[in-house]
Regions:
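Short active-site oxyanion
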Residues: 41-45, 74-77, 125-130
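Short, well-structured N-terminal submotif of metal-dependent ribonuclease cores
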Residues: 1-47, 56-73, 164-188
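Phosphate- and divalent-cation-binding pockets in alpha/beta enzyme and binding domains
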Residues: 54-55, 88, 140-141
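Acidic catalytic patch
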Residues: 75-109
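A general structural signal for well-ordered alpha-helical segments in protein cores
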Residues: 31, 52, 86-89, 116
Length: 188
């Protein structure tokens, strides 16, 4: 994605990937590069409160401190579920009910469906046009309301992080062939 939108929604999976030591070096580089680009472009990166709560469930005190540090960055926006988000959620739920299936053809537990929709509704109410999530349900809900869905792995990998692939040719073994010693001929 060459140009970042003005408002971008992320979820708990993004937050976990950002802080986890288990995240691959390439994915860490993608996230760092994305955040640098977002700050430079003056995009607003939206961290919805339900996603923050989901992250904090498994985080220790360091997780709270991390969130406090993020809160100080002006391009990061910690977003509540407010009246505008409630309106957007009602539109998402109504569309699902109009199809005759409030779960919208997903087998997920109803509580997960509601939280995923709340996350998307918060982003939609703040003008997000892109969501970054590893959760297919969040991305699908985002698509239904006209947002683009991406995973961390689909973010641009910065040039500095790209490893040069060397084509190494294995050495051939020469079984049964002995080197021949060639003596110089004496010419003089």
């Amino acid at each position: 994605m060459k140009t970042l939108p003005k408002a971008i929604l992320v979820d708990a999976n993004f937050i976990v990937a950002y802080v986890s030591p288990k995240t691959s070096a390439d994915d860490k580089a993608r996230i760092e590069h994305f955040l640098e680009r977002a700050e430079k472009a003056r995009s607003k990166v939206i961290f919805p409160m339900p996603a923050i709560a989901e992250f904090l469930v498994r985080a220790d005190l360091a997780g709270v401190e991390f969130m406090n540090r993020l809160d100080k960055k002006t391009f990061l926006h910690m977003a509540d579920f407010n009246r505008a988000a409630a309106f957007e959620l009602s539109q998402i739920d109504r569309a699902a009910l109009n199809t005759g299936d409030k779960k919208d053809e997903t087998g997920a537990p109803w509580q997960k469906i509601k939280v995923d929709r709340q996350i998307v509704a918060i982003g939609k109410s703040l003008g997000a046009t892109l969501v970054i999530s590893a959760d297919g349900s969040v991305r699908n809900n985002a698509l239904r309301v006209g947002m683009i869905g991406m995973t961390v792995q689909e973010l641009e990998l910065p040039e500095a992080a790209k490893q040069q692939k060397l084509a190494l040719v294995p050495a051939k073994k020469t079984r049964g062939i002995r080197p021949v010693l060639v003596k110089p001929t004496g010419g003089g």
